[in-house]
Curated annotation (Swiss-Prot):
Species, as recorded: Neosartorya fischeri (strain ATCC 1020 / DSM 3700 / CBS 544.65 / FGSC A1164 / JCM 1740 / NRRL 181 / WB 181) (Aspergillus fischerianus)
Basic and acidic residues bias locations: 75-84, 424-433, 462-474
Full protein name: Maintenance of mitochondrial morphology protein 1
Swiss-Prot/TrEMBL GO biological process terms: lipid transport; mitochondrial genome maintenance; protein insertion into mitochondrial outer membrane
Composition bias, Polar residues: 65-74, 85-96, 407-418
Residue numbers on the Lumenal membrane side: 1-22
Biased composition (Basic residues): 54-64
UniProt keyword list: Endoplasmic reticulum, Lipid transport, Lipid-binding, Membrane, Transmembrane, Transmembrane helix, Transport
Membrane topology category: Single-pass type I membrane protein
Domain notes: The SMP-LTD domain is a barrel-like domain that can bind various types of glycerophospholipids in its interior and mediate their transfer between two adjacent bilayers.
Cytoplasmic face of the membrane: 44-496
InterPro entries membership: Mmm1, MMM1_dom, SMP_LBD
Amino acid sequence: MSSQLNDPTPIPAQSSLSFTQGFLLGQLSVVLLIAAFIKFFIFGEAPPPPSRGLSHRSATHRRSNSIYSSTQHDGNTRTLREKPSNSNVLRPVPSSATNTRSILRKTYYTAIPTNPSSKHGRHRIHHSSHQPESLDWFNVLIAQTIAQYRQTAYLLKDSPTSSILSSLTAALNNPEKKPSFIDKITVTDISLGEEFPIFSNCRIIAVDDPNSDGGRLQALMDVDLSDDNLSIAIETQLLLNYPKPCSAILPVALSISVVRFSGTLCISLVPASTPPLDTPSHSPSPPTAQTTTTGRSKREDQTGGSHSRAGGSSEEPSGENPPKTSPKSNVAFSFLPDYRLDLSVRSLIGSRSRLQDVPKVAQLVEARVHAWFEERVVEPRVQVVGLPDLWPRMGRTGVRTGDDSETGSNAPRSSTAADASGPAHHEDSSREPEVLRFGSLLGTRPPFDLASRTSSFNVETGDLRSRSMTREESSGNLSDQFHMPGSLPGGGVTTT
């Protein structure tokens, strides 16, 4: 009995084994939970966001885009290991990308057709129910641009070839446009004005156009300009060449001022795939988008070819292998026929016994100016301007003056910034007049008034001009390569 009581009781080993198993099982479950969280919550694919207009989209609209959707789905499911061919790198653009309805829907703009019938053979216009815009910000940008052009013209007033005086003189005396009974035309006064055009009431309309899918969009905006200081004055002589050349000479002095201009400006985009615009056959057709681009490319090719031949380049001549130019988009602008252009024409005819402000001369000049304007920028005629290349390039990169950052100090400055800041240090600000005027004094020809022999005339008031700048006539080094678009049709004073 005593031996049985003294024997120690053996401790079971199952308790320590069960604790180890439970600890390992708990660690394994935690690892599995972390792995599942990382796999399904972090690396899992997010569901596609619902479309904004999915609830309002009909079944027929979804089926109409099935072709493009299948193409896009095939492109998205393409693995990274598959190397696409060179022709399939750029994804296809849907056929409705340039549709006016699609553009208006994506930009949240409404254009509701209110006049279904066409009038006078013109395209049907769909007026917009969107509220018109004031364009105050656009007026500020346009005013800054015009002010910069005026300042640039003033800084280049002494240049023999780049000044506005020499350019206008070369344009007015173009031998191909000027008739033989008009002597050399001399510009005696130029005023670039001091006011700016005001744009307002901008609205977008949809116009039916068979050349584009779904028509095209036009921006209509009202323009108003009232500036009495926007004028030009010239002097010339009418020659009587019968029975012999220069049998009689009649001095003529004219001044034209734009009192007020108001109208509706139409701006639209002309895609590169659109055929050239049609123009009436009774007048010279303005340059279309294709002809403008082709002419510009030909001039660039000729200039580039001459430089390459002068530099001894090993490239082939441009005539054998002409470079291919890609089509270019353009912007077309015009004015509606209900414009208003008020002019003030002053005239002085004769040398000894003078006729001042002849009404018939004023009527003829106003008729010529209106005809010149209507043949170029009044509907159905439009002016086509190519869109510039807006791709960022290092050659056009500039740094704003006054920035002290390290990047700005090390970055190269463009030539435009250097040219704009260069003349400002050499030009005295006190010499700038309130109204930019340029004049040239003619000592051999009498001015408007006998008391103003030593100064150029001011046709707006008829008396001496106090604020205008006068300078001697240029030495005649006019640029032969200058070309100004537009001209006064027929006889009389013509422009290039």
